[in-house]
């Protein structure tokens, strides 16, 4: 289904080498995504070349800015169809990835992909604000990822509680405004985070992306994350 040369080229542009085994995993993923998307909505992007660039290459761009040690623990918050968590795992099967989502059908899709490609992953059917207070998951991860449309202060409150001190929150968006980043500064202070790097790049021509890396420098106070309604209605800051 996928164009092998296009995946190799776009991955190489992100500093990632895709071997034949990895290509097979991505091809299976794309096929399952295409077929499952006919039954319920996982993505608006279904053309193979667009999927390669706008989903796979976009997620692989994380490797340009983050050095994942072997066996690093990562939680993908609001994973949906597996972006970016499943893409990262397909490229780096040594990672220990937990897929968090509140929608069972999406997690069932993730499980089907993992089964087909022969990789292990951890499925967590929960709301982020509930799992973030659970001792099994709170401050247990080296990395948290989110590729979402929520505002940065909201994403920080959902994601930072999962990260252990010294770990990082990787926030991916098509664009953060400088105002949005400034508005998150209070949330970072409260939650124990600090901006480590702000990376803006062109995925392809006229498609600008931004990856913000937030370092966890202190423990998150036990009162956070708050209930979802409070997070949305009154973002920190």
Regions inferred by a protein language model and the residue ranges of each:
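Short alpha-helix immediately C-terminal to the canonical SAM-binding loop
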Residues: 106-108, 177, 181
